[in-house]
């Protein structure tokens, strides 16, 4: 029993010696450089103000600091999508629904070329900053009435090549451009575009819609500059389109004639597209309502003569009349008799693929054309 104390007593000098060596080592000058951290947290420390640093040091001294590790501020991105510069690209992924976790600051969302069939109420929740949305080439046939409500600042909506049968409801008032062509829309109800006073452009061609499919007041309140209803089932110029129109494209329909009152509302038109229809006649005076018209498309119709009224259109510059049944061109069909009555010369007149021979047309017929190369003439029929 006497060996225990003796052992502890004998070890004390050794412990004291080791302790003295450790203290001496710590007191000795060191030539090593201090550790310098490089990484995310260095930037975080650099951005912290002196007050925040002092608070942290005081907490450590008082023992009240809690360890909290924050992850880097990396934005979310739906699985399989590409997110860059507030553009989220989720096209060509075979998606059957709108993906989750779309960053709330997204400006443009690309969902085209997928297999989405429905837009649900909360699909775009939180995306109030969205500027453009592409849903082109999906299988969407159903849209919840409140699906677009969160999109307070959206200006462009691309909805072509889907299975829509009606215009979606409650579209954002901020909308400027909408493309809903190549769907299955047969009817546009009254007030379908209500509240869209900022809308500038609507492309809704290639829908199986007839004239009767546009209810009275369908376009009420719109101040459009551009409207295209091509490749549809129209047999006449639709009624009550926006008076503000600058461009109206009704090509590739089944329109058979242009009546006197058809164009009365559209005094602001610059460009009118009526090509690829079945038009045999434009009633005398029907073009007189278009004083600002610059470009007129009547190609691929069944006209037998140059429409009346062209010489009185002071700003008309381009007329497409090719591929018709025009067999004769009069000397005053294009140009006014009085000098200086026309404000701008023609820079394009197409008459090829008509049964009229160019040598039978008097040179004075084109006296108000800027250059003879602007006249496209030929004697072949497609």
Region annotations inferred by a language model:
Residues 201, 207-214, 222-224, 294-382:
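Leucine-rich repeat domain C-terminal region
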Residues 100-103, 122-126, 145-151, 168-174, ...:
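A structural signal for leucine-rich repeat
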Residues 96, 117, 141, 164-165, ...:
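Leucine-rich repeat
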Residues 87, 108, 132, 142, ...:
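Conserved LRR concave beta-strand detector
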Residues 1-87, 325, 360-382:
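Terminal targeting and flexible regions in eukaryotic proteins, enriched
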Residues 93, 114, 135-138, 159-162, ...:
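Consensus "Asn ladder" position of solenoid repeat domains
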Residues 117-215:
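A generic tandem-repeat structural signature
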Residues 82-132, 245:
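LRR N-terminal entry segment and analogous cap-like coil->beta motifs
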